[in-house]
Amino acid sequence: MVDWASDSDNDKFEWDTDGEAETSSAPALRNIDAPGPSTRLPQDANGKANGSGALVAEFMGMGFPKEMILKAIKEIGDTDTEQLLELLLTYQAIGGDASVGNCSASACAPQTLEVDEEEDDTNWDEYDTAGNCDRTPHSDGSGDEDFFQEMSEKDEKMKSLVNMGFPEDEAKMAIDRCGLDAPVAVLVDSIYASQEAGNGYSANLSDYEDTEFSSFGGRKKTRFVDGSKKRKRYGSGPSGNQVPFDGSHEEPMPLPNPMVGFSLPNERLRSVHRNLPDQALGPPFFYYENVALAPKGVWTTISRFLYDIQPEFVDSKYFCAAARKRGYIHNLPIENRSPVLPMPPKTISEAFPNTKRWWPSWDPRRQFNCLQTCMASAKLTERIRCALGRFSDVPTPQVQKYVLDECRKWNLVWVGKNKVAPLEPDEMEFLLGYPRNHTRGVSRTERYRALGNSFQVDTVAYHLSVLRDLFPNGMNVLSLFSGIGGAEVALHRLGIHMKTVISVEKSEVNRTILKSWWDQTQTGTLIEIADVRHLTTERIETFIRRFGGFDLVIGGSPCNNLAGSNRHHRDGLEGEHSALFYDYIRILEHVKATMSAV
């Protein structure tokens, strides 16, 4: 059980804002700093809001159309009038009325995730037909009846994210991007991806570690911002003792900048002093991965449970054309590493040369941001096309900013004149180092979700490459929370024979993907276990007697919460599934103890 605690019952949440709304050509828009009707939501004598009706009237008095105001409130709620005003001004900047160009108001609403199975076969070209931007705005008002119910659902989602320590504005943006139906794990995924992209990471740094590093990663200076957020305490560890995860009892773990780990391919090894304690030495080797940008104290806790080994933080942008900030705790040797050949391209233009023809000069992106589990919808790409179609030459700076923000947020690529599209699953497979069609056979939605939660194979293979000479005759692997088999693919690409793999993975989709790949490429034994709770002490001992022990215990990223009960959220050890981290520790400890006794 999770026990939420607070340093003070009177804690207040105060979030930084991104600044004042930009000026725009909103009709009859007055100076919001001048005397006159307030832009804040009217309140009663008790200080409570009078409701959205008064807010609609307020913005209508400023000259915004009612349909546009209702659409904006429906998308982001009415709790933040400044953000509402900014959204309305954005509508003005990209269209001049509720539509962008002549697109319908509904098509120009802020982005929400569409993950219905009917969307799986979306033909992105169908929105590029002549006259598609000639639709006239229409609304029968039927959707407004459910309006306030949706807002209530959104408030509940926001409350959950805020209680997890995320800034309120970032929680709002994540819900806008992924939709109300998106699970909290997907929303957390989206927030971290946005933070890695720089879209809002500056909003509040008080829960994150901000550190300057030397060239290797030795600490030069660490600064922390004191926040006034509520603190959290988590439930029992494996021994039943209360373990705090709020960082209040932990020395913060510094994050290096840049995140290059102990070494990069084709670069000399940095001067690294890495003395592993005796209890951390193999057999077996172990390797544990988690998202780097975890809340303060989480990495210190993980390190403490894994023999006080310091994490190796790496951004996969040094291995491929997409960023992916991760931390790895392992007892592997760090000398004589070698990359998998051929090395993948590290820029978008090298990875997808066909995009060069359509890439505008005002789009400076050279690499993708962190690949997400949720994709942009066809409605968004249509809105962008309509916005750009209004200009015969270079669009205005306002429109450029709008388009670039969406392209960075959703990793959109240019596939035609004024036409962007999300990455296809096979393109994500290529960027992440998987063989083509590795995830083919399941729905598009499931492919995106699985790939967005997977290892970047080239990065992991570089770390595991030291095992090639140590196990020339093959190895036995215990793969915990295997996902779609990133570790197995990495070992295969290194030419390391896997004699036996015990794979623990809750998601049936992921197990199907791994089993299909295994049957096509491997000759060893694959044993799949659907629930980590089924990997009992007795079964571990049986496997060790049967196969002679394990050479590697490798754990998938706890941010990969595909099945809802198989992985942690992106905040590392947050929420009801935090016990899975202790399952990794429990299993590793028992493997080590049993093997030492054999």
Swiss-Prot record:
- Annotated region (Disordered) at 1-49, 114-146, 227-252
According to the entry, every stretch annotated as the SAM-dependent MTase DRM-type domain falls at: 272-598
Which compartments is it annotated to reside in?
Nucleus
Q: Name one GO biological process term.
A: methylation
Biased composition, Acidic residues: where in the chain?
A: 114-128
Which GO cellular component terms, listed alphabetically, does the Swiss-Prot or TrEMBL entry include? nucleus
Subunit-structure text: Interacts (via UBA domains) with EIF4A.
Name of the featured protein: DNA (cytosine-5)-methyltransferase DRM2
| Gene (name only) | DRM2
